[in-house]
């Protein structure tokens, strides 16, 4: 069977508004049939808190603490909870809902993408597993943080979450993006989450470090981001017969960026909930 051609993008380091604008621009141009399915890698400057689409900003985030720590703040197009993007490799995948990797709904598509991500990480020596889903029961206090518990088909190591992802579907196109954590920074994340008391904050921060991890801790060594990306690309190729062609943003995508970046930078978008 001939390999399917995908575009491989590495857009490097950008500010939070640009990063989210690029993901949406890729989605919109793919919806119009102007671009192939795309795997993108990127990074963030400054380190940034990204909110899930449905989160309530003023209820969950201490804006003064965000400012004091010099963090960026942006609301994602995807759902889920707050993520601190710091020392990580961020990926996104855009393809149509009827693509073989995406058919069947959210959970099956999560699983297919997780298999490729996990295979790439295993090539590095990480003994990762794919979580089957959330455990039952209620916590004493549910935080707004994404990495405090694994969700459906997310990647764990020894039961601790290593990769967190979120997905949205718009106009027949799927956007999934996620964070492959290199070193965990719970201190900054929990400093900006609103808590009922400092005692609760410290208790949940300790729990967070018990339930999440970074790749450097798992491997006992530092792996360069480029090596991680190469392994993930090879895993997609091996599992799903995808041929990746390195490329850049199209003129159509670039043409959308100014307006989309302004949307993500606007207070109305950030405070929409």
Swiss-Prot record:
Any single GO BP term: lipoate biosynthetic process
Site (Lowers pKa of active site Cys): 161
Active site: 146 (acyl-thioester intermediate)
InterPro entries per UniProt: aa-tRNA-synth_II/BPL/LPL, BPL_LPL_catalytic, LipM, Octanoyltrans_LipM/LipL
Pfam families per UniProt: LplA-B_cat
GO molecular function, one term: lipoyl(octanoyl) transferase activity
Disulphide-bridged cysteine pairs: none
EC main group: transferase
Involved pathway(s): Protein modification; protein lipoylation via endogenous pathway; protein N(6)-(lipoyl)lysine from octanoyl-[acyl-carrier-protein]
Sorted UniProt keywords: Acyltransferase, Transferase
Gene3D superfamilies listed in its UniProt record: Bira Bifunctional Protein, Domain 2 (3.30.930.10)
Keyword Electron transport: no
EC assignment: 2.3.1.181
Domain annotation BPL/LPL catalytic: ranges: 33-244
Catalysed conversion reaction: octanoyl-[ACP] + L-lysyl-[protein] = N(6)-octanoyl-L-lysyl-[protein] + holo-[ACP] + H(+)
Role description: Catalyzes the transfer of endogenously produced octanoic acid from octanoyl-acyl-carrier-protein onto the lipoyl domain of GcvH, an intermediate carrier during protein lipoylation.
Sequence similarity: Belongs to the octanoyltransferase LipM family.
Subunit (UniProt): Monomer.
Additional information: In the reaction, the free carboxyl group of octanoic acid is attached via an amide linkage to the epsilon-amino group of a specific lysine residue of lipoyl domains of lipoate-dependent enzymes. The reaction proceeds via an octanoyl-thioester enzyme intermediate.
Protein name in the entry: Octanoyltransferase LipM
Taxonomic classification: Bacteria, Bacillati, Bacillota, Clostridia, Moorellales
Gene this chain is encoded by: lipM
């Amino acid at each position: 069977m001939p390999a399917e051609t995908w575009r491989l993008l590495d857009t490097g380091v950008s500010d939070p508004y640009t990063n989210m604008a690029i993901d949406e621009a890729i989605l919109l141009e793919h919806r119009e049939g102007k671009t192939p399915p795309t795997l993108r890698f990127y990074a963030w400057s400054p380190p940034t808190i990204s909110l899930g689409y449905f989160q309530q900003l003023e209820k969950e985030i201490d804006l003064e603490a965000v400012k004091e720590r010099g963090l960026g703040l942006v609301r994602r197009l995807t759902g889920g909870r707050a993520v601190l993007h710091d020392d990580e490799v961020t990926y996104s995948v855009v393809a149509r809902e009827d693509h073989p990797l995406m058919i069947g709904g959210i959970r099956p598509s999560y699983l297919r993408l997780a298999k490729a991500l996990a295979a790439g990480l295993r090539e590095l020596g990480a003994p990762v597993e794919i979580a089957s889903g959330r455990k039952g029961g209620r916590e004493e206090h549910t935080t707004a943080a994404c990495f405090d518990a694994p969700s459906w088909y997310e990647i764990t190591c020894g039961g601790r979450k290593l990769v967190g992802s979120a997905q949205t579907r718009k106009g027949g196109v799927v956007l999934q993006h996620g964070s492959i954590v290199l070193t965990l920074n719970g201190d900054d994340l929990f400093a900006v989450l609103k808590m009922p008391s400092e005692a609760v904050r410290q208790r949940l921060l300790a729990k967070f470090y018990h339930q999440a991890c970074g790749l450097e801790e798992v491997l006992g060594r530092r792996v360069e981001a480029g090596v991680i990306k190469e392994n993930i690309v090879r895993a997609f190729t091996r599992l799903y017969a995808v041929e990746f062609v390195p490329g850049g943003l199209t003129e159509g995508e670039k043409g959308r960026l100014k307006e989309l970046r302004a949307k993500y930078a606007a207070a109305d978008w950030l405070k929409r909930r």
